[in-house]
Design a protein with these regions (language model features):
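Carbohydrate-active catalytic/glycan-binding domains of CAZyme proteins
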Residues: 1-167
Length: 167
């Protein structure tokens, strides 16, 4: 793995992408989300600080004045979430002036069983708090086994799920 957080630009969406910028180097990260809020750029990313490629447990916050900055500043309280049942990013959206972070919910022996939608209550370069407003579980009556991503940007809604099919 490259151990980088990379920003790509679509040259022919969704088929062709070009590397625009390496935002962070020498970091074991996954499921990074970058967004602008109150004239600052924020990065929420899952970092494995134990060097075991476990991206479930730690959510880290960084901020910068410019998206293309070479200086993403870590929040003093990093990791802002240290909890394997809550930390893993699973999507992001803004609605009615509110910001929402979606997290994966892991189940025993089941990666990405469900997701939770969390309203971000406070986000500054050194403060972060969120509260869970909804938990979304797979609809087992339809055969859905897992669902662990939801993202909405005003034009597109993206989510994933898996089904169990009888043989």
């Amino acid at each position: 793995a490259a151990k980088q957080i990379r920003l790509y630009k679509a040259t022919q969406f969704p088929y062709s992408w070009k590397l625009e910028k390496i935002l962070m180097d020498h970091v074991d990260a996954a499921d990074t989300m970058v967004f602008e809020h109150n004239k600052l750029w924020y990065m929420l990313t899952n970092i494995c600080s134990a060097n075991r490629s476990d991206h479930q447990s730690e959510l880290h916050l960084f901020s910068a004045a410019d998206l293309m900055s070479d200086m993403w500043v870590p929040a003093a309280q990093n990791p802002i979430i240290f909890n394997s049942k809550k930390a893993r990013n699973a999507g992001f959206f803004k609605r009615d002036q509110n910001i929402y972070r979606v997290n994966q919910v892991q189940a025993r022996a089941q990666y990405g069983y469900a997701f939770e939608i969390n309203q971000i209550i406070e986000i500054t370069p050194n403060q972060y708090s969120e509260t869970c407003i909804k938990r979304v579980e797979p609809e087992t009556k339809t055969g859905m086994a897992r669902t662990h991503h939801y993202h909405f940007n005003g034009d597109y809604t993206v989510f994933d799920h898996s089904y169990i099919e009888p043989r």
